[in-house]
């Protein structure tokens, strides 16, 4: 039976998730998003209202299409008693032996999830990413485009693995980390923070202060806000 899905997040990422849903033979009901400046449609898909309107659509399934793990987790906590949709692109290769993918997770085109891998809830396994055998991926992790995790890697909650990054086998990365684009992780990471380079090393983040609102913008992450004396990454 085909499923009908409401997407939280009307953005480029949301459009990719919508495409996965359609290619899986399911129906996209529309988007919910708190941005008041959105048009009534995005790529021909209706914008139904704000996130708070979700109660009108409780007969349908939901998926959160937002890249920021902190926001994704906050929204998941706001949506009570909904059914979560797990979006897996038809071209993704998912091993049939001892593999588990949590609810609300998105697995994009040409990604590979191998035998024995466990992926938590509301994760993003992006285009062409490789999650090798016996990986343990906790909730809200984002494995970016083309990133590769070798066998028996564990990744803690809400860690972001940047585009093209590589993680050697039998390693552990704690939660709350940002692994920069192209970084190569060759040893365990036990302290949350931003890690860049080959081999990946922790980098102290510079802060640029916005004079208008006295807020901070993390120079390392650019788009991610600086909150409570530390980078939100």
Residue ranges and their predicted role:
Residues 18-20, 74-78, 119-120, 190-191, ...:
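Short amphipathic alpha-helical segments
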Residues 1-42, 48-56, 105:
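Hydrophobic, well-ordered beta-alpha structural blocks that scaffold small-molecule cofactor pockets
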Residues 36-95:
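Phosphate-bearing ligand-interacting subdomains
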Residues 227-230:
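Basic polycationic patches enriched in arginine
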Residues 223-224:
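Intrinsic disorder/low-complexity segments
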Residues 87-203:
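Structural signal for interior beta-strand "rungs" in well-ordered beta-sheet cores
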Residues 13, 71, 185:
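Short phosphate-engaging motifs
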């Amino acid at each position: 039976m085909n499923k009908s899905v409401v997407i939280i997040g009307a953005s480029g990422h949301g459009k990719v998730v919508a495409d996965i849903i359609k290619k899986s033979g399911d129906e996209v009901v529309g988007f919910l998003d708190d941005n008041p400046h959105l048009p009534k449609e995005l790529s021909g898909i209706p914008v139904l209202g704000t996130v708070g309107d979700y109660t009108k659509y409780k007969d349908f399934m939901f998926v959160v299409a937002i890249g920021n793990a902190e926001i994704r987790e906050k929204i998941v906590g706001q949506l009570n008693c909904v059914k979560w949709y797990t979006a897996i692109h038809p071209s993704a290769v998912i091993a049939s032996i001892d593999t588990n993918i949590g609810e609300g997770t998105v697995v994009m085109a040409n990604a590979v999830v191998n035998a024995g891998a466990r992926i938590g809830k509301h994760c993003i396994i992006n285009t062409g990413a490789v999650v090798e055998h016996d990986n343990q991926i906790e909730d809200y992790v984002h494995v970016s485009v083309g990133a590769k995790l070798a066998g028996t890697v564990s990744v803690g909650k809400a860690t972001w693995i940047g585009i093209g990054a590589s993680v050697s086998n039998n390693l552990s990365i704690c939660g709350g980390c940002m692994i920069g684009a192209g970084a190569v992780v060759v040893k365990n990471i036990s302290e949350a923070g931003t890690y860049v380079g080959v081999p990946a090393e922790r980098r102290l983040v510079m802060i640029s202060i916005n004079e208008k609102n006295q807020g901070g913008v993390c120079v390392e992450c650019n788009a991610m806000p600086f909150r409570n004396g530390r980078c939100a990454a």
